[in-house]
Amino acid sequence: MAVYSKKVIENGRLNTLLYNRMYAKLLGRQTTGNASSATGIEPKGLYIAPGTISNEELLKALGDGLYLTSLQGLHAGANVQSGDFSLQADGFLVEKGVKTAPVKNFTVAGNFFQLLKQVTAVSSEVKFGVGSDYGAPDVLLSGMAISGK
């Protein structure tokens, strides 16, 4: 089956999981055309749809907070069934809408499914990693637990 366009998440709701033929048959679902091998599943061209404001406007809307630039430990610190996560992060301190200082090795924790309900703004600039099939604009979230020095 060919890969086709689908909205995995829309308006904070999970619409579909991704299935290859094996798992679709096992779970009584239709394949979504996302096989990466006989047993693997991988999205192609997966991205978060852009919003309507610039990255600068998003930082101004944040005011004071943290701008995350990387997360580590996705395989060990995230529970795919419950959505709970506790991950090491790096980023920048944001004061009055301006990135002021780098911040390293802090922890962010929460629940992925709850975060979908805590999106307050999405920037208009989608970025893909080098050689990556995954992309996203900057996203402003409320209510994430953060700890560290």
Residue ranges and their predicted role:
Residues 1-149:
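Dual-mode signal for accessory low-complexity, basic/Gly-rich regions
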